[in-house]
Amino acid sequence: MELEPIADKLQSAGLGVKAKSIFIHAMPVECKKGILLRSPLQGTQIDHELPGYYKAQFSVICRSHNHAEAVQLANDATAALKGYNTTVGAMDVRHLLPNHLPVVFPVSEGNFIEALVKFDICFSM
């Protein structure tokens, strides 16, 4: 699935700037506070029962030096993205929903905290 419209939505919500604090597929180590969007390797499922509909998952990973700030950024991203029957870029989204609350990972080598939320999306184009 194309993650660029998701990045645009996060930028429109005031959660960062693409290529400076919102990234797709890889976040540079120099970024001290930011959001990374990643899609799984299996790609986007085609719904053969409903032609033109697709199902996918993607991850939102929020980084900060501060635990509470990383979790808050993940919660803010969740609030900006989740919903039903909306348009995101060229996608007519039936649902875009988080699977869980933020999962916080241990401090990384760069001394960062990262909080992960996985999302399900069902859409047509």
Region annotations inferred by a language model:
Residues 52-68, 112-123:
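Oligomerization/assembly interface segments of phage tail-like spikes and tubes
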